[in-house]
Amino acid sequence: MKIILKDVYHENLNYLKNKISNKHHQDLLLQKPGINHYCLLSYLSKKINNSLIVELGTYAGTSALALSANPTNIIETYDLSGDPYSIINTPSNIKRNIGNIFDLNDEKKLLQAKLIFLDTAHNGDFENQVLKYLNKNSYKGILLIDDIYWNGKMYYFWSAIKNRKIDLTFIAHGDGDGPNGNISGTGIVDFNNIIDIDDSNVKKRVSTMTKIFYLKLKYFFKSIFIKNKFKN
């Protein structure tokens, strides 16, 4: 799968606006900071066809909506509870599920999915449970992880991943939409070495790369005092 990063910026999400019930979530989808995150989801959905995409962490459904951009794919999205400001016109290729995917005994769907989008508790525990399950069962698809710099636990989890991984923070979630205006980060885990990244003609902003550097430094010093439990 060839991912041409400059093409991510060309994704037009305006047609999705009428599927969202309130202005707050319209702004999440269509305005900075954060729009490049949804552009990336929409772009990735169009790179695969007739496939299952699993999202872990629905919230209002804006990410699921972006993932549904390719109508040939089925999106199974999971969250522990519904959101009162959810999408009102849910596309027919999105199926919403309430509950932990493991508690619902739906975890085999992870192995069937070509793409998994992981955006859950940001404490590293559930994220690590998913990663261990995928490795144990020889998953061959792609895992997209949201907010890899959200906090120290997420960064330790991301850093401990031994599979091939690609940091895409400079293209998505590098606009200061994390805690206290920091970047929150995006990463891809490529379990079968199927991704070819073309980052030509993409300017890596000095401000974003500088923030990444200082966050890594901050979390490194914190890790001296915190035992890293994310081993896979």
What are these regions (language model features)?
Residues 1-117, 121-144, 148-232:
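A short alpha-helical cap/connector motif
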